[in-house]
Curated annotation (Swiss-Prot):
Cofactor: how and how many bound: Binds 1 FMN per subunit.
SUPFAM superfamilies listed in its UniProt record: FMN-linked oxidoreductases
GO (cellular component) term, any one: mitochondrial inner membrane
Protein name as catalogued: Dihydroorotate dehydrogenase (quinone), mitochondrial
Name of the encoding gene: URA9
Record localization: Mitochondrion inner membrane
Membrane topology classification: Single-pass membrane protein
Cited NCBIfam families: PRK05286.1-2, PRK05286.2-5, pyrD_sub2
Other notes: K.lactis has two isoforms of DHODase, a cytoplasmic isoform and a mitochondrial isoform.
Native source species: Kluyveromyces lactis (strain ATCC 8585 / CBS 2359 / DSM 70799 / NBRC 1267 / NRRL Y-1140 / WM37)
């Protein structure tokens, strides 16, 4: 019966004219008489519209860096409003994505037993509450870290608390762990997973990562409430997010929560991280939100760049003793380097952590020192601070970073920066005839 349908249809097409065929079969025929010039106009219009749609939705478009991002900064004098607007665009699918995102094999790296197609991550602080995970990952990142998330909701410090230093490609923030709290963020992550499981994408059951992408990872950065307990708040974080994170990050280095950086002292940090690892291990058989029967997310600790060598050595010892899986170097700095171009002393002297290009020398120095004291330990080092190019990424890798993270440069340059960094990194690696994995720690071997 099915094989006869095309034969009958073709016979009708040959024995009836077009109008008779459409009327006889209850369809409305297309209006005849579209002139050549009109048809050309329609065709050109559709072509231009399609090209414009592709161009503006593609993160590689220069429009985003040179037009859209400057416009957003212009209409949001308070940098925090710009931050919120950016997250709104990313959350609602209005931000451009990286079309044809096929990472070159030289960028592939295995971290914590899992493959990433590229080692470029989005640092914590951009998406504090996990609202825009898909919008960010679709821009080409290989990893995203949301948070910091605190056990209870808290507003953070009073506004204004986020300041741009555009001449330096830098920002100062004193957000103070503003967070929706564990329950809200867990609900957001669970809703995302539920939608994914109910969609066609999960039918082949091939996605194991909680990022919901085959070769990308999701990290959750854990913080403490302003008046919270310095140990229990982190243990609550592990309990809340063990099922939802590919990676757990213990943030003991934000300069905007009173007393937090004191947790970096060796004895205190060793005790904290030992308890965190024990809590993680006790929950392994609870599985994860995708249905895995066991789940053991690696634990990383994020530290400050404002440390002398002896302090870095003691943190390395704490990390080894507690058996965490890695260290992120680094958070923002409370220093104001003399290299700053910004002359507005009121702006430069704002309290808070400085991030962006001026942070790079401090973060890189701290990374090299940390690599020196963790060599041979198996600890994974993640570089973060002032990265804005492929050359920067290469420099951090050679200093010991298996992966790098960025945020401030992304905010200034727009979503196209990720493709640019990956392209530049690929080109530089091929010039050396090496892969990313081969250059990790090259300068400290």
């Amino acid at each position: 019966m099915n094989s006869g349908f095309p034969r009958i249809l073709s016979k009708k097409l040959f024995t009836l004219n077009q109008s008779q065929f459409f009327v006889k079969n209850g369809m409305v025929p297309l209006k005849a008489g579209i002139s050549g010039p009109k048809l050309l106009k329609y065709t050109v219009g559709i072509a231009i519209g399609s090209f414009a749609g592709f161009y503006f939705s593609n993160s590689r478009s220069a429009f985003h860096e040179y037009v859209l991002c400057p416009m957003l900064r212009l209409v949001t004098p308070d940098a925090e409003d710009g931050h919120k607007l950016g997250i709104w665009f990313l959350k609602n699918g209005l931000a451009p994505r990286l079309w044809f995102d096929n990472d070159d094999k030289v960028l592939n790296v295995n971290i914590f037993g899992k493959k990433l197609t590229n080692p470029i991550g989005c640092a914590a602080g951009l998406d504090k509450n996990g609202d825009a995970i898909d919008g960010i990952l679709s821009g080409g990142f290989g990893y995203i870290e949301i948070g910091s998330v605190t056990p209870l909701p808290q507003p953070g410090n009073p506004r204004p608390r986020f300041f741009r230093l555009p001449l330096d490609d830098a920002v100062i923030n004193r957000y103070g762990f503003n967070s929706s709290g564990h329950d809200t963020v867990v609900n957001t992550l669970q809703s995302r997973i539920t939608s994914f499981i109910n969609s066609y994408m999960f039918k082949d059951n091939s996605v194991e990562n909680l990022s919901l992408y085959k070769d990308k990872l999701l990290g959750v950065n854990l913080g403490k409430n302003k008046t919270g307990d310095e140990v229990q708040d982190y243990l609550k974080g592990v309990e809340s997010f063990q099922k939802y994170a590919d990676v757990l990050v213990i943030n003991v280095s934000s300069p905007n929560t009173p007393g937090l950086r004191s947790l970096q002292k060796e004895s205190i940090l060793t005790d904290l991280l030992t308890q965190v690892v024990a809590k993680r291990d006790s929950l392994v058989t609870s599985g994860n939100a995708l249905g895995a029967k066991t789940h053991k997310p690696p634990v990383l600790v994020k530290v400050a760049p404002d440390l002398v060598e002896e302090e870095i050595k003691s943190i390395a010892e704490a990390a080894k003793k507690s058996k965490v899986d890695g260290i992120i170097i680094s958070n923002t700095t409370i220093q104001r380097p003399t290299t700053l171009i910004t002359e507005d002393s009121d702006l430069v002297s704002q309290a808070g952590g400085l991030s962006g290009k001026p942070l790079k020398p401090l973060a890189l120095k701290a990374l090299k020192t940390m690599a020196k004291y963790t060599k041979g330990s198996g600890l994974v080092l993640v570089g973060c601070g002032g990265i804005s190019s492929g050359a920067d990424a290469i420099e951090f890798a050679k200093a010991g970073a298996s992966m790098v993270e960025l945020y401030t440069a992304y905010a200034y340059k727009g979503p196209g920066l990720i493709a640019k960094i990956k392209d530049e990194t690929t080109e530089l690696l091929k010039k050396e005839n090496k892969t990313w994995s081969e250059i990790i720690g090259e300068d400290i071997k």
